Amino acid sequence: MKTVPFLSLLQAGILTSGIVAQNIAFVGSNANAIATVSFDTKTGTFKVTGNNTDSSTPSWQEVSRDGKLLYSIEETSTEHALTSYSIGQDGKLKKLKSIKGLAGPVSLDMHPTQPIIITANYGSASASAYSSKDNGELTHLGDFMFKMQGKGKVPDRQDAPHPHQALFDPTGKFVLMPDLGSDLIRILKVDAGQKFSVAPPNKVKPGTGPRHGVLYPASDKPRFYYVVGELSNTVTAMSVEYTVETIKLTEIQTLSTLPDGQRGAAGELILSPSGKHLYASNRLDKVFPGSSSVASYTIDQMTGKLKLLEIFNGGVENIRHMSIHPSGKWFVTEGQNSNDIKVFALDPETGKVTPEAKSTLEIEKPVCLQWWHNGAQESEAPEAGTETECEFDD
């Protein structure tokens, strides 16, 4: 009888589990559903394998750090709820718990090491914090209500604070929140014992309307921060300086996301897995008739400065969210208005996509796509031959 070393089986199991997980994604939509989709990395095609309709207008989703739970928020429902789901081995979702929140949540993020969730609530000029348990139970920790004096440079959009994203820094000591209404990058400080306080914010140019940002490098202590301006259609590069009380951001450079003479409403901003390239989605622009465009940039890793690589056809209308497969070889755009998702082949070295999409998935009003990960995927297999044995300040 042929025998196979247990270690080999263990390694195979770890690798297979990771591969399966990273080839499944969850698509939140304004059609009151979260779809589970499988992805074929050979053909670049999606297939819907599940559809959960337990939540209304699931506007943003995040997978828990251990890959066992999915958290989702409801932007326009009457409950404005934060909801937890268990993730089955096949990626199917089962609703666990739901907790009512403040109006208009549009983004959520999880603390890198603690069971804390932060939401940015665009519609109520606020941020909310929750604690979570392994069984999906959620507890409301508190809210932050933001204020501003008068109106901003774009008064019809900047009549009140509108935090549009919540982003924990890698140290877990701060939360960065682009505030579209106030032209600020607000900072929350995370203290011991799950205590939070408001830290000094950072200003951006009037009329920018900061929407989403990313830290670079994405791991360890970042040196740069990039933020996309919805109202100005720009990407701003900023240096990062950690102080005891806050994260200080200083502008390095600002570039347009559109060709001269074009107008639109910039949406999402994402980094490539390699960290070499940055992508900003445009919405309601006319660069490519009937489709939204995407601007790509190369990153100077020493200075943080950006250089426009290309502006390409995203193939869908109103790219509120976009994503890159963990392999770095596939670029995904989601069309909120065109009811579809496009997949483009992506060259990880050059950062460029193929002119034509490799595949299309029809799905109603997609607004967020998150890849599933799990602990096995993120853990390195042992080398061959080795043995394995919140509380708030007032």
Curated annotation (Swiss-Prot):
InterPro entries: Cycloisomerase_2 (IPR050282), Haem_d1_sf (IPR011048), Lactonase_7-beta_prop (IPR019405), WD40/YVTN_repeat-like_dom_sf (IPR015943). It catalyses: 6-phospho-D-glucono-1,5-lactone + H2O = 6-phospho-D-gluconate + H(+). It is found in: Secreted. GO terms for cellular component: extracellular region. GO terms for biological process: glucose metabolic process; pentose-phosphate shunt. Pfam families: Lactonase. Residues 1-21 form the signal peptide. Keywords: Carbohydrate metabolism, Glucose metabolism, Glycoprotein, Hydrolase, Secreted, Signal. Pathway: Carbohydrate degradation; pentose phosphate pathway; D-ribulose 5-phosphate from D-glucose 6-phosphate (oxidative stage): step 2/3. Glycans are attached at residue 51. It comes from the Eukaryota. Transmembrane segments: none annotated. SUPFAM superfamilies: C-terminal (heme d1) domain of cytochrome cd1-nitrite reductase (SSF51004). One of its GO terms (molecular function) is 6-phosphogluconolactonase activity. Catalyzes the hydrolysis of 6-phosphogluconolactone to 6-phosphogluconate. Belongs to the cycloisomerase 2 family. This is Probable 6-phosphogluconolactonase ARB_02015. It comes from Arthroderma benhamiae (strain ATCC MYA-4681 / CBS 112371).
